Amino acid sequence: MTEAFARAKINLTLHVTGQRPDGYHLLDSLVVFADVGDRVRAEPAEALSLAITGPQAANLPVADDNLVLRAARTLGGQGARLTLEKHLPVASGIGGGSADAAAALVALARLWQVPLPDPAAVLKLGADVPVCLEGRAVRMAGVGEILTPLAAPLPEAWLVLANPGVSVPTPPVFKALARRDNPPMPDDLPGWPTVESLAAFLATQRNDLEPPAIALAPEIARTRAALAAQPGCLLARMSGSGATCFGLFAAEEAARAAAEAIGAEHPGWWVAPARMVG
């Protein structure tokens, strides 16, 4: 048996800078990961199969077009018994499906002792799959295929992730964008020796998908506000196309206290404190 961890992907920034003739949007995003996520296990078997377990399993029925199965087929036609232990909410802006696909590629490559697919094949699985396969802090550009490591490591930090239980499909959010030619981040990103300096930089940047997502799901604004109101929260923003929002914290104690407070006030929300992985 082999196993791989599918960490939540967090867009600290997400600038939509253009649109290609084929309809794909051009992005400029500072991406990190949170130390919370799903797990993919792979065991030898004659045929390819998938079972989904975990607290979010009921929200993701097994289907033939599941990204985990699509990733497996990208590696070849061998058999395996796959189990996806689902902890991240579905269609929530933190790359759950893409992270699961990347984890499936890693687990199956080990099980079958085959190389990972070429970058073009990985990108065909989804725009976020390449960055999830990378699994570290990068600047993501193009349609998700241009990944540039950061010049300096990010400071130690904590995140609180909160999702109000609303599923936000990505296409309507992009369709509702007011404009698609927004400015990118600076060409040269500064170093961030402290969490406070990182938060100050992020405050000058954007998630261009946040306004249209809030128009479609006003609960996102309430989620962001709940995070921003917590003691120690340096910045609150939506990740990806929503509806999950993150709060950035310097201290683990403050992050855990914030997650507990939000969870108590909003028992129907999915809330998780997590170390930021850069």
Curated annotation (Swiss-Prot):
Coiled coil, from the record: none
GO molecular function: 4-(cytidine 5'-diphospho)-2-C-methyl-D-erythritol kinase activity; ATP binding
Active-site residues (renumbered): 9, 128
Catalyses which reaction(s): 4-CDP-2-C-methyl-D-erythritol + ATP = 4-CDP-2-C-methyl-D-erythritol 2-phosphate + ADP + H(+)
Keywords recorded for this protein, A-Z: ATP-binding, Isoprene biosynthesis, Kinase, Nucleotide-binding, Transferase
Domain of life: Bacteria
Gene Ontology biological process terms in this record: isopentenyl diphosphate biosynthetic process, methylerythritol 4-phosphate pathway; terpenoid biosynthetic process
Binding site for ATP: 89-99
UniProt cross-references to InterPro entries, sorted A to Z: GHMP_kinase_C_dom, GHMP_kinase_C_sf, GHMP_kinase_N_dom, IspE, Ribosomal_Su5_D2-typ_SF, Ribsml_uS5_D2-typ_fold_subgr
Pathway, per record: Isoprenoid biosynthesis; isopentenyl diphosphate biosynthesis via DXP pathway; isopentenyl diphosphate from 1-deoxy-D-xylulose 5-phosphate: step 3/6
Keyword 4Fe-4S: no
Broad class of enzyme this protein falls into: transferase
This enzyme's EC code(s): 2.7.1.148
Protein family (similarity comment): Belongs to the GHMP kinase family. IspE subfamily.
Role according to the record: Catalyzes the phosphorylation of the position 2 hydroxy group of 4-diphosphocytidyl-2C-methyl-D-erythritol.
Record-linked NCBIfam families: ispE, PRK14608.1
Protein name: 4-diphosphocytidyl-2-C-methyl-D-erythritol kinase
Lineage: Bacteria, Pseudomonadati, Pseudomonadota, Alphaproteobacteria, Rhodobacterales
Gene: ispE
